[in-house]
Amino acid sequence: TTGCQIIIADGLKGSDEVEVPVVGGEYVKNAKIGRAVMDADVFISLTHFKGHEEAGFGGCLKNIGMGCGSRAGKMEQHNAGKPHVAQKHCIGCGQCRKICAHGAPIITDGKAVIDHDRCVGCGRCIAVCPKDAVRIDWDETTTNLNCKIAEYTKAVVDGRPCFHISLVIDVSPNCDCHSENDMAIVPNVGM
């Protein structure tokens, strides 16, 4: 181990974020970045390459853009919209309403409905629903996803001192956010 402290950039609940303007952003106007990332005086990234089911592969740009996004930022990059409630599965328990800091879920006629004008896309309602009735459209295109990742990366590094190290070792075919790891798809190259 390095002996370095671990700091969860967007806080323990994923809600400690800063909205960073993306100058010239076509897909993202304000990136939702973990506050600790933007509070740092210098940004140093140590990343490794891996395959990625949606982006094609993940390296420095993908790891910074997606990795530094807050919970809501990750949601914004991965999806093409805000959550909705599958009415036939909703039991009207109100758990989504209780967890939402913005009051977006409203219970109407015993069922939840999400007010998209109030919703910030954090996804907490999705995680708390006992019937998986709160859903998101995950059908973002690869091109749109990669453009959003690039714009999020720009928000993190633009106008500040940065240093990046990329490693080509143990390159797995899929994103390493999965608990399992597969055989490397290329030989180890190093830095």
Model-found features: residue ranges?
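Extended, low-polarity segments enriched in aliphatic/aromatic residues
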Residues: 1-191
